[in-house]
From Swiss-Prot:
PROSITE patterns: GATASE_TYPE_1, GMPS_ATP_PPASE. Gene3D superfamilies: 3.30.300.10, 3.40.50.880, HUPs. It catalyses: XMP + L-glutamine + ATP + H2O = GMP + L-glutamate + AMP + diphosphate + 2 H(+). This is GMP synthase [glutamine-hydrolyzing]. Its EC number is 6.3.5.2. The lineage of its organism: Bacteria, Pseudomonadati, Pseudomonadota, Gammaproteobacteria, Vibrionales.
Length: 517
């Protein structure tokens, strides 16, 4: 009998912390399904979801302010374990009879927590814990039926608990890696306190997704826009495992891909894995549509519209295709729901977040819509996709369309492709590729004087860009070794005829963005 991987579940109520999605990812890593909802969810929705435990996230607001967010009262009436993190602890304390005050000694950064009481949360952990704090308010009086579990030098109630009701509050962030044993604390809550078993594994996710696709589409045919990126590639493998030749992939070569990328996609999915692929070489069509346009936002829209037109044309040739498969992932669902309603809710609502036309009259197959990116990569490995493809640096949807600054020309794209390939190759050779979060080359539409042999040349400029980041919301420029940068520059100038100068971008985000356009 197939295990229902959704049988055990944790509900995370989002109070606005930048770390909330990280909490959800940690719960998934423990092997338990969870969903992320807005803090002001209806009681009936919580009842229907029937969680085994509830986590109250951190947030930027102050419990001491009037009209600041509060957990629904049903959270504390439901009888399930509750874990409050930072703001979540503070609202729990205040709602259950304790007191919160704005502290004169704010805690941001590392802190040493001294465990002074017994708690299931600290099972198998030592009495001193290094944790990550980020708070201005603090609990100054705990509810009468709670006990103090831990403290820091400036925070008298760093952890509180009502072991009988299985309520726990921590003033620090267990979800971040800076809290050394934070994962163990979350495991103690999810596995020991809530009684979950860890049914959410890569193998079980694949089994569930394949079964769902089979049940959803029956004997119908399915069409998928295959880009060669992580999400569409994993969807292709799942759908092919579920329905075989009833899946048709459309791969559009827009002329804005990386060096040899189109050949690599066709070789892997067509020859190696045996998928049905329609290969549309549309380079000239995209270049014609982009001719004379230099505004980056307009370029993005043109590229998107041309792709949709081509995909629509190809789908109409497949008379029996009743379903459209998409690589929608959970963060897309959260963002799409929030943009429509102001709330991160609910995973079952079907938002078409892929930008394809509403009049295609096809049902949506979205086997990844419950998954975070790291989960998608893990199941991709399990499905046999190569590591270097799944863990490749991010590549923008419009491709080189936003890495060639200004107007797009074939000459510029060809030069950029070759220069970028050299940069990436040398990063691999120097064992630096996996030490930076993203690296790429940008084509600048300016000419610069150079010297080659006894002659002068007046050719184009490219910029190398490499950044280090955790979440891509902020980023530092990567301090690559000078001799490495020198080698890359020399190779590009000597091997790519048409480029006379290479520069290195040392801008952080903010104020700059990671991509130039």
């Amino acid at each position: 009998m197939t295990t229902n991987i959704h049988d055990q579940r944790i509900l995370i109520l989002d109070f606005g912390s930048q770390y909330t999605q990280l909490v959800a990812r940690r719960i998934r890593e423990i092997g338990v399904y969870c969903e992320l909802w807005s803090w002001d969810v209806e009681e009936s929705d919580i009842r229907d979801f029937n969680p085994d435990g509830i986590i109250l996230s951190g947030g930027p607001e102050s419990v001491t302010e009037e009209n600041s967010p509060r957990a629904p009262q049903y959270v504390f009436d439901s009888g399930v374990p509750v874990f409050g993190v930072c703001y979540g602890m503070q609202t729990m304390a205040e709602q259950l009879g304790g007191k919160v005050a704005t502290s004169t000694e704010r805690e941001f950064g590392y802190a040493a927590v001294q465990v002074t009481g017994e708690s299931a949360l600290f099972k198998d952990l030592e009495a001193t814990q290094d944790v990550w704090m980020s708070h201005g308010d603090k609990v100054v009086e705990i509810p009468s039926d709670f006990v103090k579990i831990a403290e820091t030098e400036t925070c008298p109630y760093a952890v509180m608990a009502n072991e009988e009701k299985k309520y726990y509050g921590v003033q620090f962030h267990p979800e971040v890696t800076h809290t050394k044993n934070g994962m163990k604390m979350l495991e103690n809550f999810v596995l020991n306190v809530c009684g979950c078993e860890g049914l959410w594994t890569s193998a079980s996710i694949i089994e569930d997704a394949v079964a769902r696709i089979k049940e959803q589409v029956g004997d119908d045919e399915v069409i998928l826009g295959l880009s060669g990126g992580v999400d569409s590639s994993v969807v292709a493998m799942l759908a092919h495992r579920a329905i075989g030749d009833k899946l048709t992939c459309v791969f559009v070569d827009n002329g804005l891909l990386r060096l040899n990328e189109a050949d690599q996609v066709m070789e892997m999915f067509g020859n190696k894995f045996g998928l049905n692929i329609i290969h549309v070489n549309a380079e000239q069509r995209f270049l014609d549509a982009l001719e004379g346009e230099s505004d980056p936002e307009v370029k993005r829209k043109i590229i998107g519209h041309v792709f949709v037109d081509i995909f629509d044309e190809e789908s109409k040739k497949l008379k029996n295709a009743k379903w459209l498969a998409q690589g929608t992932i959970y963060p897309d669902v959260i963002e799409s729901a929030a943009s429509k309603t102001g709330k991160a809710h609910v995973i079952k609502s079907h938002h078409n977040v892929g930008g394809l036309p509403d009049d295609m009259e096809m049902g949506l197959v979205e086997p990844l819509r419950e998954l975070f990116k790291d989960e998608v990569r893990k199941i991709g490995l399990e499905l046999g996709l190569p590591y270097n493809m799944l863990y490749r640096h991010p590549f923008p949807g419009p491709g080189l369309g936003v890495r060639v600054l200004g107007e797009i020309k074939k000459e510029y794209c060809d030069l950029l492709r070759r220069a970028d390939a050299i940069f990436i190759e040398e990063l691999h050779n120097a064992d630096l590729y996996n030490k930076v979060s993203q690296a790429f080359t940008v084509f600048l539409p300016v000419r610069s004087v150079g010297v080659m042999g006894d002659g002068r040349k007046y050719d184009w400029v490219v910029s190398l860009r490499a950044v280090e980041t955790i979440d891509f919301m902020t980023a530092h420029w990567a301090h690559l070794p000078y001799d490495f940068l020198g080698k890359v520059s020399n190779r590009i100038i000597n091997e790519v005829n048409g480029i006379s100068r290479v520069v290195y971008d040392i801008s952080g985000k903010p104020p700059a963005t990671i991509e130039w356009e």
